[in-house]
Amino acid sequence: MFNVILVAPEIPPNTGNVIRLCANTGARLHLIEPLGFPLDDAKMRRAGLDYHEYAEMRVHRDWDAFVAAEAPDPARMFAFTTRGSGRFHDHAFVPGDWFVFGSETRGLPADVLERFPNEQRVRLPMRPGNRSLNLSNTVAVVVFEAWRQAGFEGGA
């Protein structure tokens, strides 16, 4: 299935929502430290309800530790950013792809973003003049589009 990577998430309910999303879609969740909250944060657990036990979640101390542990295919990694030039719906996603998202207030760190070629820096369309969409909403849009492209494989 797909892989969701949150780099330094800051807001517990957003991460809780993403945990619930991953549990319901079969996506794997990777959290890259530092996290803006402890993993047992009540707000995160409340947002994720009882889905934590159904989600496959891994925590990595930093970007390099994540890459070393998971060995993702660089050609199948996509950085979602308001500074992206590509439109996400122009990509053909396949199971196993890696979707990378930055923190709610800062987005992806420059040292992570610069590792992605321009064609893999993608954005969701939105109205001009707006800063960004909510992190968990963005993740949901991306995961469901990718899953749709895969024919909702494994879904009921």
UniProtKB/Swiss-Prot annotation:
Keywords: Cytoplasm, Methyltransferase, S-adenosyl-L-methionine, Transferase, tRNA processing. The keyword Transferase applies. Gene3D superfamilies: 3.40.1280.10. It comes from the Bacteria. It is found in: Cytoplasm. It is an enzyme of class 2 (transferase). Belongs to the class IV-like SAM-binding methyltransferase superfamily. RNA methyltransferase TrmH family. TrmL subfamily. Homodimer. This is tRNA (cytidine(34)-2'-O)-methyltransferase. The lineage of its organism: Bacteria, Pseudomonadati, Pseudomonadota, Betaproteobacteria, Burkholderiales.
